[in-house]
Protein backbone atom coordinates (compact mmCIF):
# COMPACT_ATOMS: atom_id res chain seq x y z
CA UNK A 1 0.00 0.00 0.00
CA UNK A 2 1.21 3.49 -0.86
CA UNK A 3 0.74 4.70 2.72
CA UNK A 4 3.30 2.12 3.90
CA UNK A 5 5.88 3.43 1.42
CA UNK A 6 5.33 6.97 2.72
CA UNK A 7 5.84 6.20 6.40
CA UNK A 8 9.70 6.16 6.35
CA UNK A 9 9.74 9.63 4.76
CA UNK A 10 7.40 11.05 7.40
CA UNK A 11 9.43 9.40 10.17
CA UNK A 12 12.60 10.94 8.78
CA UNK A 13 10.94 14.37 8.49
CA UNK A 14 9.87 14.23 12.14
CA UNK A 15 13.32 12.99 13.16
CA UNK A 16 14.89 15.98 11.38
CA UNK A 17 12.60 18.32 13.33
CA UNK A 18 14.13 17.01 16.54
CA UNK A 19 17.70 16.99 15.25
CA UNK A 20 17.47 20.58 13.97
CA UNK A 21 16.46 21.83 17.41
CA UNK A 22 19.59 20.32 18.99
CA UNK A 23 21.97 23.12 20.14
CA UNK A 24 24.99 21.16 18.86
CA UNK A 25 23.50 21.04 15.37
CA UNK A 26 22.43 24.69 15.48
CA UNK A 27 26.04 25.68 16.20
CA UNK A 28 27.39 23.50 13.37
CA UNK A 29 26.59 25.61 10.27
CA UNK A 30 27.71 22.98 7.75
CA UNK A 31 25.61 20.20 9.31
CA UNK A 32 22.68 22.54 9.90
CA UNK A 33 22.67 23.58 6.24
CA UNK A 34 22.84 19.98 5.01
CA UNK A 35 20.05 18.75 7.29
CA UNK A 36 17.84 21.77 6.57
CA UNK A 37 18.16 21.07 2.85
CA UNK A 38 17.20 17.43 3.42
CA UNK A 39 14.13 18.53 5.38
CA UNK A 40 13.10 21.01 2.67
CA UNK A 41 13.33 18.22 0.12
CA UNK A 42 10.96 16.13 2.26
CA UNK A 43 8.47 18.98 2.69
CA UNK A 44 6.51 18.17 -0.49
CA UNK A 45 6.22 14.49 0.45
CA UNK A 46 5.08 15.42 3.95
CA UNK A 47 2.38 17.80 2.66
CA UNK A 48 1.17 15.32 0.02
CA UNK A 49 1.09 12.52 2.60
CA UNK A 50 -1.02 14.55 5.01
CA UNK A 51 -3.49 15.30 2.21
CA UNK A 52 -3.46 11.66 1.10
CA UNK A 53 -4.22 10.32 4.58
CA UNK A 54 -6.89 12.98 5.01
CA UNK A 55 -8.58 11.85 1.79
CA UNK A 56 -8.46 8.19 2.84
CA UNK A 57 -10.05 9.06 6.19
CA UNK A 58 -12.63 11.24 4.45
CA UNK A 59 -13.58 8.41 2.10
CA UNK A 60 -14.11 6.00 4.99
CA UNK A 61 -16.12 8.53 7.01
CA UNK A 62 -18.39 9.42 4.10
CA UNK A 63 -19.00 5.76 3.28
CA UNK A 64 -20.43 5.29 6.78
CA UNK A 65 -22.80 8.23 6.21
CA UNK A 66 -24.28 7.09 2.88
CA UNK A 67 -27.31 5.51 4.54
CA UNK A 68 -27.93 8.49 6.82
CA UNK A 69 -31.30 10.06 5.84
CA UNK A 70 -30.08 13.60 6.50
CA UNK A 71 -26.42 13.44 5.47
CA UNK A 72 -26.52 10.72 2.81
CA UNK A 73 -26.71 13.01 -0.26
CA UNK A 74 -24.02 15.32 1.07
CA UNK A 75 -21.80 12.33 1.87
CA UNK A 76 -22.35 10.96 -1.65
CA UNK A 77 -21.17 14.23 -3.26
CA UNK A 78 -18.20 14.50 -0.93
CA UNK A 79 -17.25 10.87 -1.56
CA UNK A 80 -17.33 11.41 -5.33
CA UNK A 81 -15.06 14.46 -5.05
CA UNK A 82 -12.56 12.65 -2.81
CA UNK A 83 -12.47 9.54 -5.01
CA UNK A 84 -11.79 11.77 -8.03
CA UNK A 85 -8.92 13.55 -6.27
CA UNK A 86 -7.32 10.39 -4.86
CA UNK A 87 -5.79 8.88 -8.05
CA UNK A 88 -4.39 12.26 -9.12
CA UNK A 89 -2.72 12.67 -5.74
CA UNK A 90 -1.40 9.10 -5.86
CA UNK A 91 0.35 9.83 -9.17
CA UNK A 92 1.80 13.04 -7.72
CA UNK A 93 3.11 11.12 -4.70
CA UNK A 94 4.67 8.42 -6.88
CA UNK A 95 6.68 11.09 -8.68
CA UNK A 96 7.76 12.57 -5.35
CA UNK A 97 8.96 9.14 -4.21
CA UNK A 98 11.24 8.64 -7.22
CA UNK A 99 14.97 9.08 -6.49
CA UNK A 100 16.07 12.61 -7.33
CA UNK A 101 18.80 13.13 -9.92
CA UNK A 102 21.45 15.04 -7.92
CA UNK A 103 22.37 16.97 -11.06
CA UNK A 104 18.88 18.23 -11.91
CA UNK A 105 19.26 21.72 -10.44
CA UNK A 106 22.72 22.32 -11.88
CA UNK A 107 23.85 24.58 -14.67
CA UNK A 108 25.01 22.77 -17.79
CA UNK A 109 27.60 22.77 -20.51
CA UNK A 110 25.84 22.12 -23.82
CA UNK A 111 28.31 20.84 -26.38
CA UNK A 112 27.44 20.54 -30.07
CA UNK A 113 29.76 18.88 -32.59
CA UNK A 114 29.47 18.46 -36.34
CA UNK A 115 29.51 14.81 -37.39
CA UNK A 116 28.88 13.27 -40.79
CA UNK A 117 27.90 15.68 -43.54
CA UNK A 118 30.78 18.14 -43.61
CA UNK A 119 29.77 21.77 -44.12
CA UNK A 120 26.06 20.98 -43.81
CA UNK A 121 26.62 19.42 -40.37
CA UNK A 122 28.53 22.51 -39.23
CA UNK A 123 25.71 24.75 -40.45
CA UNK A 124 23.18 22.70 -38.51
CA UNK A 125 25.28 23.02 -35.34
CA UNK A 126 24.76 26.77 -35.72
CA UNK A 127 21.04 26.41 -36.42
CA UNK A 128 20.39 24.08 -33.49
CA UNK A 129 22.51 26.22 -31.15
CA UNK A 130 20.43 29.27 -32.12
CA UNK A 131 17.23 27.32 -31.36
CA UNK A 132 18.62 26.22 -27.97
CA UNK A 133 19.55 29.82 -27.16
CA UNK A 134 15.97 30.89 -27.90
CA UNK A 135 14.76 28.09 -25.64
CA UNK A 136 17.02 29.21 -22.79
CA UNK A 137 15.83 32.81 -23.16
CA UNK A 138 12.17 31.73 -23.07
CA UNK A 139 12.78 29.81 -19.82
CA UNK A 140 14.64 32.71 -18.26
CA UNK A 141 18.03 30.99 -18.28
CA UNK A 142 21.30 32.80 -18.95
CA UNK A 143 23.89 31.56 -21.42
CA UNK A 144 27.40 32.28 -22.56
CA UNK A 145 29.60 30.88 -25.31
CA UNK A 146 32.47 29.04 -23.64
CA UNK A 147 34.25 27.76 -26.72
CA UNK A 148 33.70 27.75 -30.47
CA UNK A 149 35.38 26.47 -33.61
CA UNK A 150 33.87 27.88 -36.79
CA UNK A 151 33.17 25.86 -39.92
CA UNK A 152 34.79 26.79 -43.23
CA UNK A 153 31.39 27.53 -44.83
CA UNK A 154 29.71 28.94 -41.72
CA UNK A 155 28.24 27.40 -38.62
CA UNK A 156 30.49 25.59 -36.18
CA UNK A 157 32.58 22.46 -36.13
CA UNK A 158 32.20 22.61 -32.35
CA UNK A 159 30.37 24.92 -29.98
CA UNK A 160 30.11 24.81 -26.19
CA UNK A 161 27.55 26.87 -24.29
CA UNK A 162 27.28 27.33 -20.53
CA UNK A 163 23.60 27.56 -19.62
CA UNK A 164 22.75 28.86 -16.16
CA UNK A 165 19.35 28.54 -14.54
CA UNK A 166 17.37 26.57 -11.98
CA UNK A 167 16.61 23.13 -13.35
CA UNK A 168 18.63 23.60 -16.55
CA UNK A 169 20.00 20.06 -16.39
CA UNK A 170 16.61 18.54 -15.52
CA UNK A 171 15.16 19.92 -18.76
CA UNK A 172 18.02 19.68 -21.23
CA UNK A 173 19.59 16.37 -20.17
CA UNK A 174 17.30 14.63 -22.67
CA UNK A 175 18.98 16.44 -25.58
CA UNK A 176 22.17 14.38 -25.37
CA UNK A 177 22.67 12.12 -28.39
CA UNK A 178 22.96 12.14 -32.17
CA UNK A 179 20.70 14.56 -34.03
CA UNK A 180 20.16 13.82 -37.73
CA UNK A 181 19.14 16.52 -40.21
CA UNK A 182 17.67 15.99 -43.67
CA UNK A 183 17.44 19.03 -45.94
CA UNK A 184 18.47 20.49 -49.29
CA UNK A 185 21.71 22.48 -48.91
CA UNK A 186 21.76 25.97 -50.42
CA UNK A 187 24.59 24.85 -52.70
CA UNK A 188 22.61 21.84 -54.01
CA UNK A 189 21.55 22.69 -57.59
CA UNK A 190 19.63 19.43 -58.20
CA UNK A 191 17.37 19.85 -55.18
CA UNK A 192 18.55 16.61 -53.59
CA UNK A 193 18.03 16.06 -49.88
CA UNK A 194 21.27 15.55 -47.96
CA UNK A 195 21.52 13.77 -44.62
CA UNK A 196 24.01 14.91 -42.01
CA UNK A 197 24.39 14.45 -38.28
CA UNK A 198 25.67 16.26 -35.23
CA UNK A 199 26.16 15.13 -31.65
CA UNK A 200 24.96 16.95 -28.55
CA UNK A 201 26.42 16.36 -25.10
CA UNK A 202 24.80 17.72 -21.92
CA UNK A 203 27.17 17.92 -18.97
CA UNK A 204 26.37 19.37 -15.53
CA UNK A 205 28.62 22.15 -14.31
CA UNK A 206 30.47 20.76 -11.31
CA UNK A 207 31.85 22.34 -8.18
CA UNK A 208 35.57 22.02 -7.48
CA UNK A 209 34.73 19.82 -4.48
CA UNK A 210 32.82 17.33 -6.68
CA UNK A 211 35.74 16.22 -8.80
CA UNK A 212 39.43 16.35 -8.03
CA UNK A 213 42.04 16.69 -10.77
CA UNK A 214 45.69 16.14 -10.04
CA UNK A 215 47.60 19.05 -11.65
CA UNK A 216 50.30 16.54 -12.63
CA UNK A 217 47.71 14.78 -14.81
CA UNK A 218 47.28 17.88 -16.97
CA UNK A 219 49.28 18.90 -20.02
CA UNK A 220 48.69 22.55 -20.88
CA UNK A 221 49.72 24.00 -24.24
CA UNK A 222 49.35 27.59 -25.39
CA UNK A 223 49.00 28.59 -29.03
CA UNK A 224 47.93 31.31 -31.40
CA UNK A 225 44.15 31.78 -31.55
CA UNK A 226 42.60 31.09 -34.94
CA UNK A 227 39.38 32.39 -36.40
CA UNK A 228 37.24 31.73 -39.48
CA UNK A 229 39.12 29.54 -41.95
CA UNK A 230 42.01 29.07 -39.55
CA UNK A 231 43.36 32.61 -39.79
CA UNK A 232 45.06 34.17 -36.79
CA UNK A 233 42.79 36.54 -34.88
CA UNK A 234 45.40 38.11 -32.63
CA UNK A 235 49.11 38.33 -32.16
CA UNK A 236 49.31 36.77 -28.71
CA UNK A 237 49.41 33.12 -27.72
CA UNK A 238 46.10 33.24 -25.83
CA UNK A 239 44.49 29.97 -26.96
CA UNK A 240 44.87 27.10 -24.50
CA UNK A 241 44.74 23.34 -25.02
CA UNK A 242 44.34 21.22 -21.88
CA UNK A 243 44.94 17.47 -22.09
CA UNK A 244 43.97 15.11 -19.27
CA UNK A 245 46.73 12.53 -19.60
CA UNK A 246 45.02 9.53 -17.86
CA UNK A 247 41.90 9.68 -20.07
CA UNK A 248 43.21 11.45 -23.16
CA UNK A 249 40.41 14.03 -22.97
CA UNK A 250 41.35 17.29 -24.72
CA UNK A 251 39.72 20.71 -24.37
CA UNK A 252 40.73 23.71 -26.47
CA UNK A 253 39.57 27.21 -25.59
CA UNK A 254 40.32 30.45 -27.42
CA UNK A 255 37.19 32.55 -26.93
CA UNK A 256 38.39 34.43 -23.86
CA UNK A 257 40.45 37.59 -24.13
CA UNK A 258 43.32 36.24 -22.06
CA UNK A 259 45.29 33.06 -21.69
CA UNK A 260 44.28 32.90 -18.02
CA UNK A 261 40.54 33.06 -18.81
CA UNK A 262 40.88 30.47 -21.56
CA UNK A 263 42.75 28.11 -19.23
CA UNK A 264 40.10 28.47 -16.49
CA UNK A 265 37.27 27.89 -18.99
CA UNK A 266 39.00 24.85 -20.50
CA UNK A 267 39.54 23.26 -17.07
CA UNK A 268 35.86 23.87 -16.18
CA UNK A 269 34.78 22.05 -19.34
CA UNK A 270 37.30 19.28 -18.68
CA UNK A 271 35.92 18.77 -15.16
CA UNK A 272 32.39 18.59 -16.58
CA UNK A 273 33.49 15.98 -19.13
CA UNK A 274 35.25 13.88 -16.49
CA UNK A 275 32.25 14.09 -14.17
CA UNK A 276 29.94 13.17 -17.07
CA UNK A 277 32.17 10.20 -17.90
CA UNK A 278 32.03 8.98 -14.30
CA UNK A 279 28.24 9.44 -14.18
CA UNK A 280 27.73 7.47 -17.39
CA UNK A 281 29.93 4.65 -16.09
CA UNK A 282 27.93 4.63 -12.86
CA UNK A 283 24.60 4.57 -14.73
CA UNK A 284 25.77 1.77 -17.01
CA UNK A 285 26.81 -0.28 -13.98
CA UNK A 286 23.48 0.33 -12.24
CA UNK A 287 21.62 -0.47 -15.44
CA UNK A 288 23.37 -3.83 -15.76
CA UNK A 289 22.67 -4.62 -12.13
CA UNK A 290 18.97 -3.78 -12.55
CA UNK A 291 18.87 -5.28 -16.04
CA UNK A 292 16.90 -2.36 -17.40
CA UNK A 293 17.72 0.72 -19.44
CA UNK A 294 17.01 4.11 -17.90
CA UNK A 295 18.29 6.07 -20.88
CA UNK A 296 18.46 9.85 -20.58
CA UNK A 297 20.10 10.42 -23.93
CA UNK A 298 22.75 7.89 -24.84
CA UNK A 299 25.05 10.02 -26.95
CA UNK A 300 26.00 7.05 -29.14
CA UNK A 301 22.42 6.61 -30.35
CA UNK A 302 20.38 8.60 -32.86
CA UNK A 303 17.70 10.28 -30.82
CA UNK A 304 16.08 12.74 -33.22
CA UNK A 305 15.58 13.54 -36.90
CA UNK A 306 14.91 17.00 -38.35
CA UNK A 307 13.37 16.62 -41.83
CA UNK A 308 13.04 20.06 -43.41
CA UNK A 309 11.23 19.10 -46.67
CA UNK A 310 8.47 17.46 -44.60
CA UNK A 311 8.59 20.11 -41.83
CA UNK A 312 8.91 17.10 -39.51
CA UNK A 313 10.76 16.55 -36.25
CA UNK A 314 10.80 13.01 -34.84
CA UNK A 315 12.12 11.82 -31.49
CA UNK A 316 12.92 8.14 -31.89
CA UNK A 317 13.04 7.28 -28.18
CA UNK A 318 9.30 7.74 -27.72
CA UNK A 319 8.11 7.57 -31.35
CA UNK A 320 7.01 11.20 -31.23
CA UNK A 321 6.53 13.02 -34.55
CA UNK A 322 5.52 16.66 -34.93
CA UNK A 323 4.95 18.44 -38.23
CA UNK A 324 6.00 21.88 -37.00
CA UNK A 325 9.76 21.82 -37.31
CA UNK A 326 9.83 25.41 -38.57
CA UNK A 327 8.02 26.77 -35.49
CA UNK A 328 10.04 24.68 -33.03
CA UNK A 329 13.37 25.80 -34.48
CA UNK A 330 12.32 29.43 -34.94
CA UNK A 331 11.06 29.89 -31.37
CA UNK A 332 13.00 27.17 -29.53
CA UNK A 333 9.83 25.30 -28.58
CA UNK A 334 11.66 22.22 -27.32
CA UNK A 335 9.27 21.77 -24.39
CA UNK A 336 6.88 20.22 -26.93
CA UNK A 337 9.36 17.34 -27.07
CA UNK A 338 10.94 17.53 -23.61
CA UNK A 339 7.63 17.35 -21.69
CA UNK A 340 6.56 14.04 -23.34
CA UNK A 341 10.08 12.68 -22.79
CA UNK A 342 9.95 13.52 -19.08
CA UNK A 343 6.49 11.93 -18.77
CA UNK A 344 7.75 8.79 -20.55
CA UNK A 345 10.82 8.34 -18.35
CA UNK A 346 8.89 9.12 -15.17
CA UNK A 347 6.31 6.46 -16.03
CA UNK A 348 9.14 4.02 -16.76
CA UNK A 349 10.84 4.83 -13.46
CA UNK A 350 7.58 4.40 -11.52
CA UNK A 351 7.05 0.99 -13.11
CA UNK A 352 10.64 -0.08 -12.38
CA UNK A 353 10.31 1.07 -8.76
CA UNK A 354 7.14 -0.97 -8.30
CA UNK A 355 5.12 2.03 -7.14
Swiss-Prot record:
SUPFAM superfamilies: Release factor. HAMAP family: Rel_fac_1. The keyword Cytoplasm applies. Residues 278-308 are annotated as: Disordered. PROSITE patterns: RF_PROK_I. One of its GO terms (molecular function) is translation release factor activity, codon specific. Peptide chain release factor 1 directs the termination of translation in response to the peptide chain termination codons UAG and UAA. InterPro entries: PCRF, Pep_chain_release_fac_I, Pep_chain_release_fac_I_sf, Prokaryotic/Mito_RF, RF-1. Residues 278-293 have a biased composition (Basic and acidic residues). It is found in: Cytoplasm. The keyword Cytoplasm applies. The modification N5-methylglutamine is found at residue 231. GO terms for cellular component: cytoplasm. Pfam families: PCRF, RF-1. SMART domains: PCRF. Belongs to the prokaryotic/mitochondrial release factor family. Its main location: cytoplasm. The lineage of its organism: Bacteria, Pseudomonadati, Campylobacterota, Epsilonproteobacteria, Campylobacterales. This is Peptide chain release factor 1. Methylated by PrmC. Methylation increases the termination efficiency of RF1. Keywords: Cytoplasm, Methylation, Protein biosynthesis.
Amino acid sequence: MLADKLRPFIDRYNELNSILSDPEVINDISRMTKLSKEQRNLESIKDATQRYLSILNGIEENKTLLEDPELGELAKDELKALETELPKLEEEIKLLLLPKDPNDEKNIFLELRAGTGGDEAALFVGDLATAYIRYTEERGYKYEIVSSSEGSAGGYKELILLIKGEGAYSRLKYEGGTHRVQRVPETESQGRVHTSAITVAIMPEVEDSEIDINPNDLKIDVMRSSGHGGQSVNTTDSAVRVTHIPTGLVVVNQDGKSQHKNKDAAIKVLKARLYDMQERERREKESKERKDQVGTGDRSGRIRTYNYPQNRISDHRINLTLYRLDAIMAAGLFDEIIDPLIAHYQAEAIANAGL
